[in-house]
Amino acid sequence: MNSHSHQTVRAETSRRDFLARSAAAFSGTLLCGGIGRAGEPLGYRIELTTAREGFDRKTGKACWAQSRAGIIPPGVPGNPGDRPLCLITTQPLLLSGSDVYTCVHEMRSDDLGRTWTPPKRCPTLARRIVSDDVEVALCDFTPTWHAATGRLLGTGQTAWYLNNRLMPNRTRETGYSVRDPQTGEWSPWKTLELPDVPRFKSAGAGCTQRVDLANGEILLPVYFKPVKDRCYSATVLRCRFDGQELLYVEHGDELKHDVPRGFCEPSLTRFDDRFFLTIRNDVTGHVTSGPDGLHFEKPRPWTFDDGTDLGSYNTQQHWVTHSDGLYLVYTRRDVRYDHIFRHRAPLWIARVDPQRLCVIRSTERVIVPQRGTRLGNFGVAQVGPTETWVVTTEWMQPAGVERYGSANRIYVAKIHWNRPNRPA
């Protein structure tokens, strides 16, 4: 796998220049996102960039997958500069099987994603050998800044392998790791201790978006089930984090749906003092909201504002949250893309009506285009007041997807807002 960029080049502009550029970058097309509180239409411009690319099926046994950004703000330990330090975590996916992951890697950019270092292996986030034929990996990793402790905390889940294949009737734990601000190294990954009850024997935070509260507590969505059951349920954990250890305090409503595999990969956000949860399901994605991030209304299927089905199924959706507008990033059915596995490309973005809990069809746009393969495992990160990123990877399964132009690109879709995103 060849890096798209082999060196990180330090830009000469300052953080002030970055903010000015973001605010003035609207000579391109503005996409209407609703009327903000000050009466000015909220808009944004999409800048699609590539952090790395390159794939050769003849020699490649793996492709990069599960790429997500983590942002360390300026002027904090580990980033004394005047611009955000941007990271991408990603990990090799073996093409010989299904969801067979190895060690998490890290890429860095100190020039706001103009250039990136090649993926570097993080030994502390590697697989662990349990026995001669059993190994366990940390996967589905999402790094997110925890302001109260000044640490980048990554959360995900474990995957257990028997002879390098997913183990049947396996457990699933919520895994996490903390990046040391002085050394830049990730701590050896740990698992979150949950109540010792059967339904939490398979409980993970893979691919989920969390919310950090002002007091430093964390609302972490997970999905769970007894090991031998078929259907998952979703809930939100309230956790404490001291900069090193993540501790369970309580969990909220247990949301259930008896449709194949139930509710998976929930993602949480907060907008206008209310919490919103989007949830994966095999048949159709669901959405709900609640007052405190723990208790929710009955989830309902995602629809457009005209009442028709959104068509997002069997993969994750994530939130893009601006203080003046709530957006959803998702995949959905479209006859133009029947050649793509589970219609997991392109990635769409649209504004959400937070009262009606629906997607406003007229605001829908493609944020990452399709090139014949899936993009459905992705993440969202706020880079600064006027910039938000959506990061995803071209997943090089099944064989032959490259004939449509896919090349295992790690995309960074930069959303440039025309108005600053105010802190919650």
Residue ranges and their predicted role:
Residues 11-20, 26-39:
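N-terminal twin-arginine translocation
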Residues 4, 26-29, 77-78, 357:
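Short amphipathic alpha-helical segments with coiled-coil-like heptad repeat character
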Residues 39-63, 71-136, 145-203, 211-265, ...:
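Beta-rich carbohydrate-recognition and catalytic domains
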Residues 378-388:
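Short, intrinsically disordered, low-complexity segments enriched in Ser/Thr and Pro
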